[in-house]
Amino acid sequence: MRLEAENLAGERGGETIFSHLSFTIGTGQALVVTGPNGSGKSTLLRIICGLLAPEAGEVKLTEGTQIVPVRAACHYLGHQNAMKPALSVRENLLFWQKFNGGEALDIGAALEAVDLAGVEHLPFGYLSTGQKRRVSIAKLLVSHRPLWIVDEPTAGLDKASEARFAELMREHMRQDGMIIAATHIPLGLDGAISTTGNALVRSLDMAAFSVEDIA
């Protein structure tokens, strides 16, 4: 599987914030998107997963010679956790499992993977900020999508949870998954190398594509 972005431009509030942005990632690889606040990291991720239309350019996901709809192949984890506070943790994850299809881990195993075993009966709104984020990470595990698009995924996590999520990302890559992550802090993926010696993690600095810098 291969994801290509070609000559993308994105706008916010009617003003172009980045342009001439291109990249390619393949199976088992990750792209870490960095840059100052307001540089367009979140806008780029929303364009890639189809939540926003690009001002220019295109995004294409292919498997062999077949074009695959990005929306059908990706998990998107944004700033918001996208969970109903009044529903239990289990009910929220069950909704997303059925909505996304492609069952992977069962809910209990997914919660155990984020060190939240035993909370599935609790209302989501009862959880702490860090626990809520970990439930949202568990959402990535209860149904299989090859492409993870995650925006500041470690927000609200402690160091132990950050390390646990880094290992989950590495495992996803080992299973031929792809990851695009926007972040302002290290995600613990630096230095990942394939068996052939190729770097599996690339970085993209949004500052290099800002309209001011290009002008």
Swiss-Prot record:
Residues binding ATP: 35-42
PROSITE patterns membership: ABC_TRANSPORTER_2 (PS50893), CCMA (PS51243)
The keyword Membrane appears for this protein: yes
Enzyme class: translocase
GO cellular component terms attached to this protein's record: plasma membrane
Domain of life, source organism: Bacteria
Family listed: Belongs to the ABC transporter superfamily. CcmA exporter (TC 3.A.1.107) family.
Protein's name according to its UniProt entry: Cytochrome c biogenesis ATP-binding export protein CcmA
The species this protein was found in: Brucella abortus (strain 2308)
Gene: ccmA
